[in-house]
A protein has these predicted regions:
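Cytoplasmic membrane-interface "Motif A"-like loop-to-helix N-cap segments
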Residues: 58-69, 341-355
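Glycine-rich segments within core transmembrane alpha-helices of 12-TM secondary carriers
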Residues: 119-145, 168, 411-424
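C-terminal ends and interior cores of transmembrane alpha-helices
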Residues: 70-83, 355-370
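C-terminal membrane-cytosol helix-exit motif in multi-pass small-molecule transporters
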Residues: 165-188, 212-228, 246-264, 448-458
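Extracytoplasmic gate region of multi-pass secondary transporters
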Residues: 16-17, 208, 212-242, 280-323
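Extracytoplasmic
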Residues: 1-31, 47, 136, 299-304
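Helix-breaking motifs and short loop linkers at transmembrane-helix boundaries and internal kinks
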Residues: 28, 60, 81-86, 98, ...
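Helix-to-loop junctions at the C-terminal end of transmembrane segments
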Residues: 48-60, 332-345
Length: 484
């Protein structure tokens, strides 16, 4: 049930992309405005994933996911009722909050599966959930055409988008009444302090502050983009006001982080070796998620138009080709987790896959209209496989860093995926597709080197149970599957 909850959040999150061209024509949007809406769709997911991670660790996945699914109906209906660019900006910013749903399932899955199986379990969850992007790309246009009789014969995109929100809200109620946070007899571990991530060294505290600044920077970049002359959504004075508010948010985050970690910083508290972790490892996973999921977000948003314009294809044909990218998640993301489980080293799995991402996008840089279309598709799918397998490999490591803070760590890592999406799409909006592909390829190459030199193998990566828990007997495991 959890993967389907994730699937629905992705259907909602990406329900605009299949209709971008149609909506642009009906509401007289410029190409720059359509690109900007793609960035808006990702923006609030950045802080939302961190906030959702905190709520998740405190209240559990059952309550958190249920409320998020019900909330999804709000931006879906707002998008369906939009009459101009300003309405769409607001609705897509709100939709970014729905994109934070992924984090919830990471904690839920980690509660039900031991470390030795976490890679494939998280991969299946993520693969089927990300399949929602394909579901939106492939099925929503069909629904819109089928409902055209309610729209004077024209594609009824408003009905299709509204329907996704209604279904999500209904499933939110079903989810709340059908799942539990942990197997029977297992205690849901909560962090001792709330409001910010608890770190275990002074160096990690400063690394956390730098990490928080990066996310604020991405939001500031979006504000700058919305203030450009060809967008006309924010004035210069409004942009400066947004920057001031973001500076205040950063100051508040820093204050909360200080409150949570005050005893450590003033020397009153030290952590025993069994409780320590390096935030540097979280930061490296954040970078890996920039290069894999961040690039996936960017490519999913621009690929239909890329094939349409590069090869002169019909919109429907280009959309079906582009839909193969998220469709591949069914295979690639679980395989990344499975390889991480079976290869014997999660570190080197992450390193090699990051290198594959680099090769794929650097090859995609050279795609142009002279290429045979099948070859262009093959190169795109090569890059897609490694990017999506990288997501699976990243989240085969994230839940193993500090169990009781899994929600917050997953939220931070996930937020940087959206950071990557915002930065990459901003680069794309200012340049072209070949520049975007080369930028993503170079970033992945740097990431591969950093993982090879600095990423550490998590403690007890392939254990039968988390530290402090008894290994589950076969009988208990079968009970878990039955009760799910």
């Amino acid at each position: 049930m959890t993967w389907f909850a994730f699937f629905l959040t992705f259907v909602c999150w990406f329900n605009f992309a299949p209709f971008a061209t149609t909506i642009g024509k009906q509401l007289n949007l410029t190409p720059e405005q359509i690109k900007t809406l793609g960035i808006c769709n990702l923006a609030l997911t950045i802080p939302a994933r961190i906030i959702i991670g905190m709520l998740l660790d405190r209240f559990g996945p059952r309550i958190t996911y249920s409320l998020l699914l019900i909330f999804a109906s709000v931006p879906c209906l707002a998008t369906a009722l939009s009459q101009n660019f300003e309405h769409l900006v607001i609705s897509r910013l709100l939709m970014g909050i729905v994109g934070a749903g992924f984090v919830v399932g990471i904690r839920m899955v980690s509660e039900w599966f031991p470390p030795k199986e976490i890679g494939i379990a998280q991969g299946i969850y993520g693969g089927w959930g990300n399949f929602g992007a394909f579901g939106a790309e492939f099925t929503l246009p069909t629904i819109a055409v089928a409902a055209s009789f309610m729209n004077g014969g024209a594609s009824n995109w408003r009905f299709a988008i509204a329907l996704t929100g209604i279904i999500a809200a209904i499933y939110g109620l079903i989810y709340y009444n059908s799942v539990q946070d942990t197997p029977v007899g297992k205690v849901y571990k909560r962090p001792k302090k709330n409001g910010a991530l608890e770190v275990t060294s002074v160096k990690s505290f400063w690394a956390l502050i730098i990490s928080n600044f990066g996310l604020i920077f991405a939001l500031g970049l979006l504000a700058w983009r919305l203030a450009q002359k060809n967008i006309h959504f924010l004035t210069q004075s409004q942009m400066y006001l947004v920057w001031l508010l973001l500076a205040g948010l950063f100051a508040y985050q820093t204050y909360k982080a200080y409150q949570v970690n005050k005893e450590l910083l003033i020397g009153k508290k030290t952590y025993p070796p069994s409780e320590r972790y390096q935030f540097r490892q979280v930061a490296l996973l954040e970078f890996t998620y920039v290069t894999n999921f961040g690039s996936e977000l960017a490519v999913v948003s621009m690929l239909p138009a890329f094939f349409e314009k590069t090869f002169g294809l019909e919109h429907v044909v280009a959309g079906m080709i582009a839909a193969a990218y998220p469709f591949l998640n069914l295979i690639s993301r679980p395989s990344g987790g499975l390889i991480s489980d079976k290869f014997g080293s999660r570190k080197w799995t992450m390193t090699i896959i990051s290198g594959g991402i680099a090769v794929g996008y650097l090859m995609a840089h050279f795609i142009n209209s002279s290429w045979p279309i099948p070859l262009a598709i093959a190169v795109t799918m090569f890059a897609a496989y490694f990017a999506q397998a990288g997501c699976g490999a990243t989240y085969s490591i994230a839940p193993l860093i500090k169990k009781e803070a899994t929600g917050q760590i997953a939220g931070n890592v996930g937020a940087y995926g959206n950071f990557g999406g915002v930065v990459y799409l901003t680069i794309f909006s200012l340049t072209d597709a070949s520049t975007l592909f080369s930028t993503m390829g170079i970033a992945a190459m740097i990431c591969a080197f950093m993982c090879g030199f600095f990423l550490k193998e998590p403690k007890d990566s392939f254990a039968g149970a988390y530290e402090g828990e008894l290994a589950e007997t076969p009988t208990k495991r079968s009970t878990i599957f039955t009760e799910e």
